[in-house]
A protein has these predicted regions:
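Beta-propeller blade signature
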Residues: 116-129, 189
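Bacterial N-terminal signal peptides that target proteins for export
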Residues: 2-16
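Acidic/hydrophobic-patterned starts of short beta strands in beta-sheet-rich repeat architectures
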Residues: 92-109, 169-173
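N-terminal signal peptide c-region/cleavage motif recognized by signal peptidases
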Residues: 25-27
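Short consensus segments that form the blades of beta-propeller domains
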Residues: 44-45, 109-117
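Flexible low-complexity loop/turn motifs enriched in small/helix-breaking residues
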Residues: 31-89, 102-103
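Acidic, small-residue rich beta-repeat scaffolds with periodic aromatic anchors
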Residues: 30-59, 132, 137-202
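Beta-propeller blade termini
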Residues: 82-92, 159-165
Length: 202
């Protein structure tokens, strides 16, 4: 039996690698991205620019840095990236809430295991003028712990897997893979000023 020579194998491997890159590029182009800001009253928006969250006016000018507790301020300063699952606030019982995912690098060594990965935590912030008060937090993605948000086969940003629900008021989170659990859907219902896991409404 003849064995393919090394040049032939190299050509096949290069073609396969090129096909994979083209496929990934096509998926990236088709992906529905997460919002880069959250709309608030008066044409303003909340955006992240390292190391803080800012209130940005209609012209794009930063007007005010949101005041947050020290622990969240440190998390934002150390973040590798920040994402907004929804482009709008959610008003519940007369109070406005904001969803934000703060990511940090999985590994301080870029060439190590999970060096390019991230560990993400969802925060639900209650807005009080220029203050943002965390009312709930939840780890939602992790390279180290094999936790990944749903992407609909790569067609959408993983942050789109975190959504507001109207009735009952709360947050739906869908994971493509939750360690030792596979695909998972959980609901966090608003109650007494915070959010707690509850049965997923039918």
């Amino acid at each position: 039996m003849r064995t393919p020579n090394s040049p032939t194998i190299a050509v096949v491997l290069k073609a396969a690698a090129l096909a994979l890159l083209v496929f990934r590029a096509a998926v990236a182009c088709a992906e529905t991205p997460a919002p880069d800001s959250v709309r608030i009253a008066g044409g303003h928006a909340i955006e992240w620019e390292r190391p803080k969250l800012f209130d940005v006016d209609a012209s794009g000018k930063k007007t005010t840095a949101l005041r947050v507790p020290a622990a969240l301020r440190r998390a934002l300063a150390d973040a590798s990236s920040v994402a907004f699952p929804s482009d709008h606030l959610k008003r519940i019982d007369g109070t406005d809430y904001l969803l934000v995912v703060v990511n940090r690098s999985s590994n301080s060594r870029p060439t190590g295991y999970c060096g390019a990965g991230e560990e993400g935590t969802l925060y639900v912030l209650e807005l009080r003028g220029a203050r943002a008060v965390p009312r709930f937090s939840l780890p939602v993605q992790s390279c180290l712990d094999s936790v990944s948000l749903e992407t609909d086969g790569g067609a959408q940003s993983p942050y789109r897997a975190i959504t507001w629900r109207d009735a009952p008021a709360g947050i739906d989170v869908r994971w493509e893979y939750l360690a030792h659990g596979g695909a998972t859907h959980r609901f966090y219902r608003f109650a007494n000023g915070t959010f707690a896991e509850a049965e997923v409404p039918r």
